[in-house]
A protein has these predicted regions:
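A short, N-terminal "cap"/entry segment at the start of jelly-roll beta-barrel domains
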Residues: 1-43, 123-128
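Ligand-binding loop in jelly-roll beta-barrel domains
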Residues: 30, 92-120
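Conserved hydrophobic/aromatic beta-strand scaffold that supports enzyme active sites
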Residues: 32-34, 46-50, 67, 87-89
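Short beta-strand/loop turn elements enriched in aromatics
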Residues: 37, 51-62, 112-113
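Short histidine-centered beta-strand/loop micro-motifs
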Residues: 47-49, 58-62, 79-80, 98-100
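Glycine- and acidic-residue-biased ligand/ion/polar-headgroup-sensing regions
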Residues: 52-55, 62-77
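Short acidic-glycine-tyrosine-enriched beta hairpin
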Residues: 77-96
Length: 128
C-alpha cells in the first residue's frame, strides 16, 4: 500500500465537471466528477453529480445501496425533497429516480453499479 497521503487527495483545481455518460447514454443536464475510482471494479464509487434545473436521472436500482449528501440546491427522490446539508442512505436494492427543479450538487457513494429499470414511472408510488 502506498502511504503517501498525497496519492489519495483530489484537489479542487485538478478536477472538472464532465457530462454524465453511462453505457453510451448521455444524461442531459447532469455532470459528474469522479472522486474515487475503484480499479478492481473499474468504476467510480465516490462521485459528485451536478444536476441542472429540470434534469432527471431515471428510475433505477442500487444492488449495493447508496449514500447521498446534498452539497447545494434541492433534489427530489420518491417525492421527498432533499436540501443542502441533507443526507440519505438507501439500503441494498432500493429503487428510485432523482430529479430537481432548481438544480443541485450532490456527493454520492455507490458501492455497486446501478441498474436502470425499464418503466414509465418517475417515482415508485406513481401508477403506470
Amino acid at each position: 500500500m502506498n502511504t503517501d497521503i498525497n496519492n489519495y487527495i483530489v484537489r479542487n483545481n485538478q478536477i472538472e465537471w464532465q457530462p454524465l455518460i453511462e453505457k453510451g447514454i448521455h444524461y442531459q443536464g447532469i455532470s459528474v466528477i469522479s472522486l474515487r475510482f475503484d480499479g478492481a471494479k473499474q468504476r467510480s464509487t465516490t462521485i459528485m453529480l451536478k444536476f441542472e434545473p429540470g434534469a432527471t436521472y431515471p428510475y433505477h436500482n442500487h444492488p449495493g445501496g447508496e449514500e447521498i449528501f446534498v452539497l447545494k440546491g434541492e433534489a427530489i427522490l420518491e417525492n421527498v425533497t432533499l436540501s443542502q446539508g441533507d443526507y440519505l442512505y438507501t439500503p441494498v436494492n432500493f429503487k428510485h429516480s432523482v430529479t430537481t427543479q432548481k438544480g443541485c450538487i450532490m456527493l454520492f457513494v455507490v458501492p455497486e453499479e446501478v441498474e436502470i429499470l425499464k418503466t414509465n414511472k418517475l417515482f415508485t408510488n406513481e401508477k403506470n
